Amino acid sequence: MDGAIFIWKGDIMTEINPQESRRAEAYALWLHAPMPMVTFFRTLDVTRLLRCSRRTGLKFNMLMCWCIGQAASGIEEFYTLPVGDKLIRYDQLAVNTIVLNREDGISSCDIPFSAELSQFNRDYLALTTQVRESC
């Protein structure tokens, strides 16, 4: 079972000057925040995605993760996050999902985002299985 979806990640990190970025104001607000996180709530009609899942046999949550990654990949701000007291620019995104592990607990799993759905699906299945079994 998969759950909450968050976006972050990157393999190559570059520290940037916050005052020279479009994230300067957000960085200043988040710098001393106890939990620097933003949560969006929105009701979405996922009927077409559910039909696609049933028609293709692809997991619904994987499709949701891919759609969120696809939307986020076009927004520059998602690549830049505060880390400690630094502002870091990442080279790629990953979608973080919560996986029910074999001990009936929850574990976090990062799936590197790929615009190619078949590659994202392979990574999703392999990584969520690995995380599920490793606890």
PLM regions and their residue ranges:
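Small-residue-rich loop/turn and linker elements
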Residues: 78-110, 114
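Helical lid/core segments from catalytic subdomains that handle acyl or acyl-like groups
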Residues: 101-135
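Short secondary-structure capping/junction motifs at helix and strand boundaries
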Residues: 75-82, 133-135
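Acyl activation and transfer enzymes in specialized metabolism, enriched
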Residues: 49-75
